[in-house]
């Protein structure tokens, strides 16, 4: 599906991370909310600054489920460290591999934790020679791969079962972005999908509630529907997947091969 998105770790600035104090501030802010699961993008570089005991000790103070996204090279290190600590956490892992991974084949994880494994595809060769769940990654020069394997076709729309709840939702909000907040390694806070920072974790009196209120007022991405784009005249605009981060980052707000002028 063209709009599917995953919080995959980035090779760029891979050593950058929130401090343990910043992480504590963020999780403290979530205690009185309805948030149940926190996604954490992790690199072993974090363990060069803090011990695994410090990280696990902090996370265990809260009653959240944690979904950790990391590369396969980092997975065994963190799980081995966690298993040495006599503290139970509600943890699951999304483990990513790509052509640069030292483990070049999919393997079975022997762990007490739930693990999903995904392979990152940068070009058509990555897609053709790998099995399992494959995630296309936009590099800026692989438009042909996205056009062939990711873009929505008219047949995709015609085969879609119309769901009135989804149809109404797509008219009012963007389900890819709505309710999601991103916190970057430098502490800047964004509405998911937005390039505009709303606040920083280090700001005096920082509050995630204020961040949510600000997004509701400014409407950066949470209500970015196809009606707000050049798709606004397309009769399928509320059946298509909502606007995705790929479309925003690539400045291509139309991930399909549908020419509605010819319909």
Question: Model regions: which residues?
Answer:
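C-terminal accessory region of radical SAM enzymes
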Residues: 142-163, 194-241
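Conserved SAM/AdoMet-binding glycine-rich loop
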Residues: 2, 23, 27-104
């Amino acid at each position: 599906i063209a709009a599917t998105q995953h919080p995959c770790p980035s090779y760029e600035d891979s050593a950058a991370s929130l401090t343990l104090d910043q992480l504590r501030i963020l999780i403290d802010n979530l205690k009185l909310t309805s948030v149940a699961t926190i996604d954490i993008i992790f690199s072993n570089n974090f363990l060069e600054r803090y011990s695994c005991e410090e990280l696990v000790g902090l996370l265990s103070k809260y009653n959240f489920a944690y979904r950790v996204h990391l590369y396969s090279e980092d997975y065994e290190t963190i799980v081995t460290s966690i298993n040495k600590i006599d503290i139970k956490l509600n943890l699951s892992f999304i483990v990513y591999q790509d052509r640069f991974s030292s483990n070049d084949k999919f393997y079975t994880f022997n762990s007490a934790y739930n693990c999903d494994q995904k392979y990152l595809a940068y070009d058509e060769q990555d897609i053709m020679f790998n099995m399992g769940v494959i995630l296309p990654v936009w590099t800026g020069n692989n438009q042909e791969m996205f056009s062939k394997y990711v873009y929505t076709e008219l047949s995709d729309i015609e085969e879609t079962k119309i769901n009135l709840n989804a149809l109404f939702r797509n008219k009012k909000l963007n389900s890819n972005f709505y309710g999601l907040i991103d916190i970057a390694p430098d502490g800047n806070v964004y509405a998911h999908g937005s390039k505009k920072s709303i606040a920083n974790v280090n700001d005096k009196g920082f509050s995630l509630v204020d961040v949510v209120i600000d997004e509701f007022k400014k409407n950066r991405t949470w209500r970015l529907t196809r009606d707000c784009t050049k798709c606004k005249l397309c009769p399928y605009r509320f059946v298509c997947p909502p606007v995705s981060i790929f479309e925003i980052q690539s400045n291509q707000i139309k991930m399909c091969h549908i020419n509605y002028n010819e319909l």
